[in-house]
């Protein structure tokens, strides 16, 4: 299975995986509006890979088969202040 991976120009670090290059027919219109004009990053042979950097490859394959697309969003930012407060045991109580 080869899929096309596109990055968003509007949403940093957001990627859209689709079954075929330039085929966005199964991607919902509201998602396409939010994503903006897709920019092709690569064609990716999923059957030759065991893992992906930030996504579960099996989930990607299932969603491509069922929905025709997979949306990869960036992980939420780490709140370093909150992490530090936990580390030192700070509590407002």
From Swiss-Prot:
InterPro entries, alphabetized: YcgL-like_sf (IPR038068), YcgL_dom (IPR027354)
Please give one Pfam family short name: YcgL
SUPFAM superfamilies reported in the protein's UniProt record:
YcgL-like (SSF160191)
- Every copy of the YcgL domain together lies at 1-85
Name it. YcgL domain-containing protein Shew_2183
